[in-house]
Amino acid sequence: MKTQVLVVLVLCVVFCLAESRNSMTSEERGLVSLMRQRDDIAKRLQCKCKGDAPDLSHMSGTIYFSCEGGDNSWKKCNSISVFADCCHKKPT
């Protein structure tokens, strides 16, 4: 009986520690969101399609591993690297 109680207690402690490591504060979530936005902007700056204006707000491209995947509404306009293409929306 003592062993069972000890096992349950240890499992509770382990579960509580795991949960505390996974929970983020609102400040941490905000920081993660800002980092993702910064990464998105950096990717957009790398992705320039022919005819795009030099400022970020007029760039039409976005980076994908393959422009032909998904809903087939994107067209390759540039290559960023061996693993990534710069794609923009196909005209409708």
UniProtKB/Swiss-Prot annotation:
Record key words, sorted: Cleavage on pair of basic residues, Disulfide bond, Ion channel impairing toxin, Nematocyst, Neurotoxin, Secreted, Signal, Toxin, Voltage-gated sodium channel impairing toxin
This protein's name: Calitoxin
Secreted is among the record's keywords: yes
Domain of life of the native organism: Eukaryota
Main location: secreted
Disulfide cross-links: 47-86, 49-77, 67-87
The protein's role, per its UniProt record: In neuromuscular preparation of crustaceans, the toxin increased neurotransmitter release, causing repetitive firing of the axons. May affect sodium channels (Nav).
Entry's localization field: Secreted; Nematocyst
Gene3D superfamilies linked to this entry: Anthopleurin-A
Residues annotated as signal peptide: 1-20
One Pfam family per UniProt: Toxin_4
InterPro entries in UniProt: Myo_ane_neurotoxin_sf
Tissue: Expressed both outside and in acontia, a specialised envenomation structure laden with batteries of venom-containing nematocysts found only in the superfamily Metridioidea.
UniProt similarity note: Belongs to the sea anemone sodium channel inhibitory toxin family.
Record propeptide residues: 21-42
